């Protein structure tokens, strides 16, 4: 089946496009009711790779199609991981066009996933994008001249994960403070005996 849906975001196309390029965009757009969890987001919309976790230990690997990429206007992701690739046969084209009221965002999906499931997911994505972009516009006068570096505790929880994603899509750098096994972009900390240099280079602690 195929599904095409469009909506207008009240912001310039360049701003909406840039928002999608930032780490955290995928997390912000993933519905909490969907059985998927973002693991890594592509560092490039042109030819990067995104990984999502599914139930039963399965992974959804989406590769971006360079041949259908137009900077500022269009990017495409295709599911490439077995067995999901055969089951879903997923291809998603994201398009951005100038509109008198801002940006016309069009999502075109070709897949075997039932349409009923997709409609609720894309309705959530549309409203979330509008809400996030509108929020950034409302606080624009409060934004610092230079991006901040924010250390976040509890970043693996529902609220912490959402906050971290919102900060990065706003252009700030987030350092996650974790108890063990830190990955790139994370720092290990002991809340009872933190390292003296734990917050080096950090502007804000949450």
Where are these regions (language model features)?
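Hydrophobic-ligand binding "helix-grip"
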Residues: 27-28, 32-35, 41-45, 49-112
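N-terminal Rossmann NAD(P)H-binding glycine-rich loop of SDR-like oxidoreductase domains
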Residues: 148-170
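A conserved amphipathic terminal alpha-helix motif
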Residues: 109-146
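Residues at the starts of beta-strands that form the adenosine-phosphate
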Residues: 104, 149, 173
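N-terminal Rossmann-fold cofactor-binding loop
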Residues: 177-181, 191
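Conserved Rossmann-fold cofactor-binding substructure of NAD(P)-dependent oxidoreductases
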Residues: 187-204
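Hydrophobic ligand-binding cavity/cleft-lining segments
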Residues: 1-43
């Amino acid at each position: 089946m195929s599904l095409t849906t469009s909506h207008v975001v009240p912001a310039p196309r360049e701003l909406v496009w840039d928002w999608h390029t930032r780490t955290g965009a995928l997390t912000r757009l993933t519905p909490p009711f969907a059985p998927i969890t973002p693991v890594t987001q592509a560092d490039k919309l042109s030819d990067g790779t995104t990984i999502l976790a599914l139930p039963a230990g399965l992974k959804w690997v989406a590769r971006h199609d360079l041949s259908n990429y137009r900077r500022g206007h269009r990017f495409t992701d295709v599911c490439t991981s077995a067995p999901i690739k055969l089951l879903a046969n997923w291809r998603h084209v994201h398009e951005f066009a100038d509109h008198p009221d801002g940006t016309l965002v069009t999502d075109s999906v070709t897949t075997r996933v039932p349409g009923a499931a997709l409609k609720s997911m894309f309705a959530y994505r549309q409203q979330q994008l509008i809400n996030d972009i509108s929020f950034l516009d409302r606080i624009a006068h409060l934004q610092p001249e230079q991006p901040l570096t924010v250390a976040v505790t509890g970043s693996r929880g529902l609220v912490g994960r959402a906050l971290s994603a919102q900060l990065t899509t706003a252009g700030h750098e987030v350092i996650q403070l974790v108890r063990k096994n830190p990955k790139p972009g994370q720092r290990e900390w002991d809340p009872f005996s933190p390292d003296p240099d734990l917050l080096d280079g950090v502007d804000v602690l949450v």
